[in-house]
C-alpha cells in the first residue's frame, strides 16, 4: 500500500515535466516559489515603490532593481513605455539610445497609466525614436555631476557637457529631486549679504539664504548686474556661483560664457588647459529645448549649488534666468500630460512646483544659497499667476527701470520701487535704516516736484525745494557705480563699496555736507572720497 502512493506522485510529476505549456499553471507556481527565493520577491514588487521614491530624493539604495521596458508610443516630447515587470517610480529616470543620432536620451516618469505602462517626459528631442525599442529604468531620478569639477563648465539638464571641453571631471553625483533641509538644519538668523553695489546694499539689502526677484526688461542692464553680483560675491566671500539658464537664448548664453571669461570670473580652458580657478558653473536649458529640459534645468543648477552649501560649507549665489520660463515650461508639460489647466492656462500644480524649487533655497547651519531670479511679468500684470506664485517666496525685489537706464545711470535700479524684507532697524541697524529712509524721502519729494518743474521751471520753486532737487539729483547720480565686469567697455576701474562706506557717504549727502560739489562729480564713482577727488579734478580742468 505504501509503494502505490509513492509511485502516484512520481507519475504525476512526469506529465508536469513533459507538458511544458502547463508550467504557468498553479501546480508549477508553488514549486517555483518554494525552491527559488529570488522569484518569490517579484510578486512583492509593489512594496519597493516607497524605496524608489526615497531614492529619487536622497541616496540610491543598493536594493533597487532596474527594469527594462519597450517604447509603445511617442507624442512629441511625451513617450509611453510598457514594462513587463516592476514599474519605475514617479520621477525615475529612464534611458534609451536615439537610433537616429546614437545619443543617450533620458526621460522622466510623470504618470502611471495602468496596464504596466508609464508616461514620461523627454529631456531632449524625440525625433528618431521607434516603437518597440528598449528603454531601461535607472532606478532613481536624474543624476548630475556636482563639485569643483563643474566650475567653469557648461552642462545641460542631464549633466552632459555642452562646451566642447571634454567630460566633466567629477566623480560625485547627485539626484536633481531632493528634499528641502529640515527645520533643525535651517538657520533663522537674518544676516545681510553685502554685494558691494551701493544702491542694493542701501535701499534693498539682500539676505544670506534669501530669494531675490530681479525685475527688468530687455536692455536695462539685467545681465551685467547679475555678472557683477557673481563677481563680487565670489571675491568677497570666496564663494561659488551657479547660473541656471531656463529658456535662455543660445546667443545670450554663449555671450555670457565668454563675458565671464573676459571678466576673470571663469578661467579660459583653451588658454590655461583647464577650468581650475573658475568660480561659476553654468547649466543651460536653451529656448529650443523640449519643455521637459526647461522645466528641470533649474533643479539641476540647484543640485550643484546644494552640494557647495552642504558639503563644502560655502555661501553660494544661484541665478535663475528666467523664472517665468520655468513656469511656462511646466505649463507645457502639464498640457502634454493631459492635465486640466488652471487659471490663465497654467498648470494646476503651479504653486507646488514653485514651492518645491524655492523651499530648497535656504540657509543651513553649514552654508547658504542666495538666489537671484530674473522674473518676467506678462503684460505688466503683477496679478498674473506666474509672478504671483514667485512673490510669496521672495525676500527682496530689485526693480530695474528703463527710465533710469535712459539717463545712463547704471545699475538702473529704481530705489523707490525696490523692497527688502530685512529693511528693519532691528536687523540692519538704526543708522542704516534712517539713512535709507532719508534717501527715499528726498527722492520721493523730487519725484513729486518733477511735474511742477516741467511746467513752470526751477525758478518757481522755493529755496527749500531747490535744495531738495539739487540733493536728489546728486543722490540719483551717486547711486550709479562702475562695475568690474564692465571695465573693458567703459575703461573705468570697477568699485566695490563696503556697506559702512555706503551708509556714511549717503548720510553726508542728505545732511548737506557735499552741497558745494557739482552733480557731475557724483556720477560713476565708488565711495564719497572719489566724488570729492573728481570734483577737484573737474575744478582744475575748468
Swiss-Prot record:
Gene3D superfamilies: 2.40.10.170, Bovine Mitochondrial F1-atpase, Atp Synthase Beta Chain, Chain D, domain 3, P-loop containing nucleotide triphosphate hydrolases. It is found in: Cell inner membrane. It is an enzyme of class 7 (translocase). Pfam families: ATP-synt_ab (PF00006), ATP-synt_ab_N (PF02874), ATP-synt_VA_C (PF22919). GO terms for cellular component: plasma membrane; proton-transporting ATP synthase complex. Its EC number is 7.1.2.2. Transmembrane segments: none annotated. It is a peripheral membrane protein. ATP binds at residues 216-223. Belongs to the ATPase alpha/beta chains family. Produces ATP from ADP in the presence of a proton gradient across the membrane. The catalytic sites are hosted primarily by the beta subunits. This is ATP synthase subunit beta. It comes from Caulobacter sp. (strain K31). The lineage of its organism: Bacteria, Pseudomonadati, Pseudomonadota, Alphaproteobacteria, Caulobacterales.
